[in-house]
A protein has these predicted regions:
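Gly/Ala-rich beta-loop-alpha elbow adjacent to hydrolase catalytic centers
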Residues: 37-46
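Active-site loop/oxyanion-hole signature of alpha/beta-hydrolase fold enzymes
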Residues: 1-34
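Short beta-strand/loop motif that positions the catalytic acidic residue
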Residues: 140, 146-148
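Catalytic histidine-centered segment of alpha/beta-hydrolase-like enzymes
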Residues: 7, 178-190
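Flexible "cap/lid" loop of the alpha/beta hydrolase fold
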Residues: 51-86
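Conserved alpha/beta-hydrolase catalytic His-Asp/Glu region
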Residues: 72-73, 87-138
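Catalytic histidine neighborhood in serine/cysteine hydrolases
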Residues: 164-181
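Conserved alpha/beta-hydrolase "acid-adjacent" motif
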Residues: 153-159
Length: 204
């Protein structure tokens, strides 16, 4: 994703990211995908892709479609303070260790955050603070599983319900005692189990 690696490309928004991905696949003549997945910010991007290209993939797995729905000055403060806090957390020795049960996951998260520039982090915080799934009547054909942890249910509820209404066949999964993004980042084997069930059975 733009802004997440050692390059000069900033993350702008999930909408912009979705357009880049769709364009890349069109340019390379790839139009028959089995699966699209996204967690956290990636969930926003995956949702945008499905809304723009309703036949983009046969299956979709979306985790932690979260937003706080902040507006105006509150959103600006959230972006400004959040930018500084997340950088501080990533640079403080031991602070994020074990956040996702796996040390490699914490190390990878810290490395990624420390490599982000100010503009990318600001845009990510704004996206996280006010992202809202677009209302539309066009149906999405990908058989979809939307997951979230019970500890983030309140923040995920609105976007999940809006997107669910736009999908022909959709399963909602609430994972007990899980936090934001904990499935994909901290428990990859369990994440893979959900993927296998979605593809092999069509639902769980």
């Amino acid at each position: 994703m733009s802004g997440h690696e050692l390059n000069d490309v900033d993350f702008i928004s999930s909408t912009h990211e979705a357009e880049l991905i769709i364009t890349w696949f069109q340019k390379h003549g790839i139009n028959d995908l089995l699966l699209i997945c996204g967690a956290s910010l990636g969930a926003h991007v995956a949702a945008e892709i499905l809304q723009k290209q309703r036949t983009f993939a046969q299956y979709a797995m979306i985790e932690s479609l979260k937003a706080y729905q902040y507006k105006g000055i509150i959103l600006k403060l959230f972006s400004y303070i959040g930018n500084k806090v997340i950088k501080k957390c990533a640079s403080t020795k031991g602070y994020m260790d074990g956040t996702y049960n796996q040390k490699y996951a914490s190390d990878d998260a810290k490395c990624t955050i420390n490599n982000m520039n100010k503009k990318t982090l600001e845009n990510i915080m704004i996206e996280s603070g006010n992202y809202q799934i677009k209302q539309q009547k066009t149906k999405i054909f990908a058989e979809t599983m939307i997951l979230y942890g019970s500890k983030e249910k309140k923040e995920c509820k609105s976007n999940t319900e809006i997107l669910q209404k736009q999908i022909e066949k959709c399963t909602i999964v609430e994972i007990p005692k899980y936090r934001h993004g904990e499935l994909a980042i901290g428990n990859p084997y369990k994440h893979l189990e959900y993927l296998k069930k979605l593809i092999s059975q069509g639902s769980i």
